[in-house]
Design a protein with these regions (language model features):
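Short coil turns that delineate tetratricopeptide repeat
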Residues: 393, 427, 475-476, 511, ...
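Alpha-helical repeat scaffolds
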Residues: 377-386, 414-422, 451-471, 495-507, ...
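Active-site recognition of the HExxH zinc-binding catalytic motif
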Residues: 44, 166-179, 190-194, 269
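Non-catalytic architectural context of zinc metalloproteases
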Residues: 16-165, 180, 200, 247-261, ...
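Beta/coil-rich, acidic/histidine-enriched accessory regions frequently appended to metallopeptidases
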Residues: 19, 291-448, 528, 532-535, ...
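Terminal, low-structured helical/coil segments at or just beyond the last alpha-helical repeat
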Residues: 506, 519-522, 526-559
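Alpha-helical adaptor scaffolds
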Residues: 404-407, 435-445, 453-458, 468-505
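Acidic/His/Gly-enriched intrinsically disordered linker/tail segments
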Residues: 32-33, 121-152, 180-340
Length: 559
């Protein structure tokens, strides 16, 4: 079968004050021999590999071990989750063809880039090139994501697959924490990421660093003296980011308030992980998870941890000297083993769905850093997807990815056909359902069948159908709730409070999504539900970032 050669562009080296532009992998068909793509599923990931089976298994095993270690700091329940399995694409480094550089040069010429004045230089990553010419090199590890999915691409060196030499990047963990819904409490996100920045992997364990404290540490005598103010803030100040006044005991003159809060948040997370022989970990996880749904309160803290804020402050103060002076190690009590998983030759459909989805994700990434090359990436994604489509594959997953590819490429007309066909064949991913709902709403608005230029009940139901399918999947998408609100705003059918409760759900998930808050407030005002409307108006006034937006909510309050 043809070889898909991995090509990675790094744009021309700019003058000294400018940096090169790194572009993601570009997979080009070449008439060369090579091993087949292999397919498998493990630890929730869907795997497409161009490596030998033994290397593939070593990578997946290492991936599994790293996530097991991460679970000691960040359990799966507190990470981003999706109904769409994340993709792991592996490519053997030794399959790089010698002609790769020339292919890239030709593509850059077609994009009107400067013609290099030197020949192809494999391995030229360490060479200093003329400023007018492009440099090319492999990008060995890249993660891209959509609103409902994620994909990881790795170039694998056969002799360097060792979990003790690998780690999960800060960027990856930052994504897992910040994209998790409902949103995790800010103190936990800040504290965990502050610690994770310097956390080290090795020997089957995590080494968590000492807390970088912002002021001199208290002595043992000071900690025991009730006349000496506590060296740590009260729990409400930490949990709710209520910073003490500068120059006070809690915030000495010259201390950075943000760094002081981060230090407290890191101390609280570190205490939850380590203190009293890790006795508080399960309770801390429960408190964090429930806080994301219910909000933070002392009653919840007491229920989960067994004591209140004052006692927690005392314990944090006693723990501070330990946390600020030494690191500590975390490892699973009983290391889990990855269950065996089969690897089989990937079908044309599997290659198209996985590789095409990856290439689709590359397009907006490239558009943001080198817009003139984005059409080349879009063309390649379309070719990959079309290859299976032209062989009469009509799978809902393939059609959904093709539809999203056209949406991202700006062709809603083509996208609509693929998305409708996908939805008719079976369940599709949440973003595909959301985009189908958006396109159906646009059509209904352009051809309203209801009274007074509104869409009628049949149109309303048809638009809501894919939106509610998306709502039932993970992750929740704010656009889904905004579209549901727009449907009710455009419909000649009056929604009940039960219907509107779905929009309430969206606001709880996305309280800072000002467009959604505004739509909710307008609907409740329009339909005479004053109490609920006032709650959304007050929220909008709190989270609005400019005066024109605040003026909109003030006008709603006056209606």
């Amino acid at each position: 079968m043809p070889l898909f050669a991995l090509l990675v562009l790094v744009a021309a080296a700019a003058p000294a004050q400018e940096s090169a532009v790194s572009l993601p992998p570009f997979l080009v068909e070449e008439a060369a021999k090579g091993p087949p793509w292999r397919h498998g599923e493990a630890m929730g990931f869907e795997i497409l590999s161009r490596c030998g089976d033994s290397a593939t298994r070593r990578v997946v095993e290492a991936h599994f071990q790293l996530h097991q270690l991460l679970g000691e700091m960040l359990p799966p329940s507190l990470r981003w989750q999706s109904s769409v399995p994340p993709l792991l694409i592996l490519y053997d480094e030794e399959l790089q063809p010698a002609a790769s550089q020339e292919v890239i040069r030709q593509m850059l010429r077609r994009a009107d880039a400067p013609e290099p004045e030197f020949g192809a230089m494999p391995g030229g990553r360490g060479l200093r090139m003329p400023s007018a010419a492009p440099r090319y090199s492999f990008l060995p590890n890249l993660r891209l994501w959509d609103r409902d999915g994620m994909a990881i691409f790795m170039i694998v060196r056969r002799d360097q697959v060792d979990a003790d030499r690998l780690s999960l990047t800060y960027d990856y963990v930052n994504f897992l924490v910040r994209q998790r819904l409902p949103l995790l409490p800010a103190w936990f996100v800040g504290g965990l990421l502050t610690l994770y920045q310097k956390t080290e992997y090795g020997s089957g364990q995590l080494t968590v660093p000492a807390v970088d404290w912002f002021s001199p540490l208290p002595t043992e005598a000071q900690l025991k003296d009730p006349a000496v103010p506590s060296p740590v803030w009260s729990l409400p100040e930490v949990l709710q980011q209520r910073l003490p006044a500068p120059g006070t005991t809690g915030l000495p003159a010259g201390a950075d308030p943000a760094k002081a809060w981060q230090a407290h948040a890191a101390l609280l997370v570190r205490w939850g992980l380590e203190a009293d022989k890790q006795a508080h970990r399960a309770g801390m996880w429960r408190f964090i998870e429930r806080s994301a749904f219910e909000g933070t309160s002392e009653a919840l803290f007491r229920e989960c941890l067994g004591f209140g804020y004052d006692e927690a402050r005392r314990r944090l103060a006693a723990f501070l000297p330990v946390a600020a002076r030494r690191s500590f190690r975390l490892k699973p009590a009983r290391p889990a083993k990855l269950p065996p998983f089969p690897l089989t030759n990937a079908s044309d459909l599997q290659i198209a769905c996985i590789k095409g989805d990856w290439e689709r994700l590359e397009v907006p990434y490239v558009r943001g850093i080198s817009a003139e090359l984005a059409p080349k990436y879009l063309d390649q994604a379309r070719r990959t997807l079309r290859r299976a489509y032209d062989r009469d594959h009509r799978d809902p997953r393939l059609l959904a990815v093709m539809g999203l590819c056209e949406v991202d490429g700006g062709d809603d007309t083509a996208a609509r056909g693929f998305l409708e066909s996908a939805a008719a064949l079976g369940p599709i991913r949440p973003r595909a359902s959301q985009e189908l709902g958006r396109l159906r709403l646009a059509e209904a608005r352009a051809n309203p069948a209801g009274a007074n230029g509104r869409i009628d009940t049949n149109q309303t139901v048809r638009v809501l159908e894919p939106l509610f399918a998306a709502r039932a999947a993970l992750p929740p998408l704010p656009e889904v709730y905004e579209l549901i609100a727009q449907v009710w705003a455009a419909s000649d059918a009056k929604p009940t409070l039960r219907h509107l409760a779905v929009i309430d759900e969206g606001v709880k998930l996305f309280p800072r999504r000002i467009a959604l808050v505004r739509l909710a407030a307008e609907l409740y005002v329009r339909d005479g539900h004053r109490e609920q409307a006032d709650a959304f108006i007050e929220l909008g006034l709190r989270v609005a970032e400019d005066e024109p937006t605040r003026a909109i909510f003030s006008a709603l309050r006056a209606r």
